[in-house]
Amino acid sequence: MPLAESRGGASGGVWGNAPTVFRALNSKKATNKGAGSEASLPVTSRSRRSAPKLLYPLLAYCRAEWARPDSRKGDILIMRQTRTVSLDTLEYLYIPDVTYATYGETQRKMQLIIPYRPQWQDGETVPLIVFLPGSAWYRQEMYNGIPALAKLAERGFAVASVQYRESKIAPFPAQVEDVHRAIHHIAEQLAKLFHIDMARTFLMGNSSGGHIALLTALRQAAGIADVSELLNFPIRGVIAESAPSDLFLCAKEGVPANMPATFHPTADLLGVSCPQEHPEKLAEASAQTYLAPGHAVPPILLLHGDSDAQVNVAHSRTLYERLTQNGADADYIELAGVNHGGAPFWTEDVLQIIADFIHKHC
């Protein structure tokens, strides 16, 4: 008889969200098999795959702890206790490497982390966060951040972590074009399937990803159609963490001392050897360029550590001042003693600030 049922929870489990049922054999079979034998505790799942080796110790533990009865009545095991548990967070699905655009032999992909319910209510949808990883505009690492992004999915937000073309492949504004193509792909292919409300789309990014999130929203607010053949979906808000917003300041300060001598992110993003000689390109890739009274700038949340050694905190301080001067809805959170990115931006306090910002503007 079934002893317990487990669905892949917030950690994704060994099989993600495929329902998994642990069963103990009847008492005779359980007695005949050794305590550590996986054969005495078979597993069935929706896909009917065999249990991964990583699960064997768990199965043995379940058999030892769950199948310990207070009394026996034939083959029926009577449990010692019954407990009621409640979940404060949603389960989620992780769908890796979804291709949204192809440029010759180059594919751009996204990672999807989607809230999961066994049964959705009619018309129930979730907001979308399009997340852009930081990478100094070079090739992004797309997998290490999944556990952190899953915390947002647990709070009820669909997350699409979007890989955009690195500067070595294409200079700015190719990265902004990729964001539009990713949003369009989600709207056309995925939104209905995963209960995503495209009218509640937010952009989020850290470091260079935050820069691309800002530029995508601000260029759209200024009436610039970066991908003319695609319909622009409304952007309800932007969350930018440790983001460079003033490329003139980047060019002036040069490469951080802890970076290799061959590291020239600003020059590579603009596709030039000396950024200072191309002020028009620096302006095109700077957020402040697109701020003007009357522009329909979406709400913006800026977060920055005051001890950032890679992206000067002046970027966010100055941008916040310019946003408020132009009548934009902007919030700025400065994290005391925090360097560039990392774990401080994924604490429960910061996640709650982000969640409150999204709920406020949904």
What name fits each language-model region?
Residues 16, 72-362:
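Alpha/beta-hydrolase superfamily serine-hydrolase fold, recognizing
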Residues 1-24, 30-38, 43-69, 74:
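Short, low-complexity intrinsically disordered segments enriched in small and basic residues
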